[in-house]
Design a protein with these regions (language model features):
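A positively charged, amphipathic N-terminal helix/segment that binds anionic biomolecules
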Residues: 1-106
Length: 106
């Protein structure tokens, strides 16, 4: 059973690696619409906020770039999700490999 699970994990890791190769431009952050006068929703503008290397930043975004930035943010979220899955699977793979090599140890 463990050997079978190890092979499943290896196949899943290979699929994750392939998916990572297909990720295009990416950028962390959240894109929000702000208003100069929030009560009347007047003076709308876009901004992106993100934290990188423990430093928080906020930048204004032109309307024509909103669509591209949404794609880049989605790519970054996908990247982070895939990396997390890879790490979880790698830990499980390591544990199973050690159990198969020495079944006496739990």
């Amino acid at each position: 059973m463990s050997q079978k699970r190890i092979h499943q994990i290896e196949r899943r890791i290979d699929r994750i690696k392939t998916a990572l190769l297909e990720i295009g431009p990416m950028r962390p952050g959240s894109l929000t619409r702000q208003y100069k006068d929030p009560q009347y929703h007047a003076g709308a503008y876009w901004q992106i906020s993100y934290t990188r290397r423990m430093k928080s930043r906020t930048e204004y975004v032109r309307r024509e770039w909103v669509k591209d930035l949404r794609r880049q943010i989605a790519s970054h979220k996908r990247f982070k999700s895939l990396v997390e899955q890879w790490i979880d699977l790698s830990i499980e793979h390591s544990q199973l490999t050690m159990q198969v090599a020495d079944p006496k140890v739990t």
